[in-house]
């Protein structure tokens, strides 16, 4: 499974002032959003992940949506939002640190999972997504790279990256096409108004398939980077399970109920949670989820108020004076993947270097 290259390394950019509460530990990633760093709380010694986004034009409605939606979610299977801080050059989003890394990397190292291990992570994924939906938030970009793991022996899955999420309370019904081609539901590709919750189910199904098979269900094995072909196969729901992969009939049935082109007849999350394959070996803490969110509160650290966050975001839209070295770094990391140079520039579809697809509506 291919993914876009990520550049990491020492970054010449301000961390935070010495008087602030976090100390720099190391760089942990970068992307089109900016950079991510591991920091340590000076008071509690807790490790946190900090996502830095350049002040100015990059602080758009997607960033605001990510922060506001993420702030409202408190669940064991969702990376915990802590606060936002304004630095001289960046908006810093402080989050829980998931020391186990990406589920994507775990699958790459293993090749594929056993059915029991895939079910273990799928149950947690469904728990987190179900909670999001109960809070009237659809994620819209569920994928392996957006599912992290904590460092425990039986890893707890953590959903992250709410940049494409949409709230039915705060926002209109989704209509734009966002996400990564391999995970996108057919109705989303058709650019019609759609139910983001049902589209999330499709993406969960892709994640389950990849855990079981070690490959994406709708990619052409001969031409995995041919996104047009991937899209065609999604629209026609053309997938198969390799003959050498042993999967139980119950699991195959669940996958066949998820990969349904018509969202009206696709299985829903409440229905998945009553499916015999899902219920097998279901952890006790996932059986009764009525108080899952409330038990995750942190009384010693009050949640940053919405007014404070909105004020910080507003200030972050004002560009800061920058040094040339940082400008060079950020520009270098926004170069498009050479593999996409020959893609039809006249196409209505915009696919970026990571394989993400966006229709601007």
Swiss-Prot record:
Regulation: Activated by autophosphorylation of its activation loop.
EC number: 2.7.11.1
Pfam families (alphabetical): Pkinase
Record keyword Chaperone present: no
UniProtKB keywords: Abscisic acid signaling pathway, ATP-binding, Kinase, Nucleotide-binding, Serine/threonine-protein kinase, Transferase
Keyword Transferase: yes
Induction: By abscisic acid (ABA), salt, and osmotic stress (at protein level).
Reaction catalyzed: L-seryl-[protein] + ATP = O-phospho-L-seryl-[protein] + ADP + H(+); L-threonyl-[protein] + ATP = O-phospho-L-threonyl-[protein] + ADP + H(+)
Family membership noted in the UniProt record: Belongs to the protein kinase superfamily. Ser/Thr protein kinase family.
Function comment: Together with SRK2D, key component and activator of the abscisic acid (ABA) signaling pathway that regulates numerous ABA responses, such as seed germination, Pro accumulation, root growth inhibition, dormancy and seedling growth, and, to a lesser extent, stomatal closure. In response to ABA, phosphorylates the ESCRT-I complex component FREE1, which is required for ABA-induced FREE1 nuclear import.
Cited PANTHER family: SERINE/THREONINE KINASE, SERINE_THREONINE-PROTEIN KINASE SRK2I
Protein name in the entry: Serine/threonine-protein kinase SRK2I
Organism (species): Arabidopsis thaliana (Mouse-ear cress)
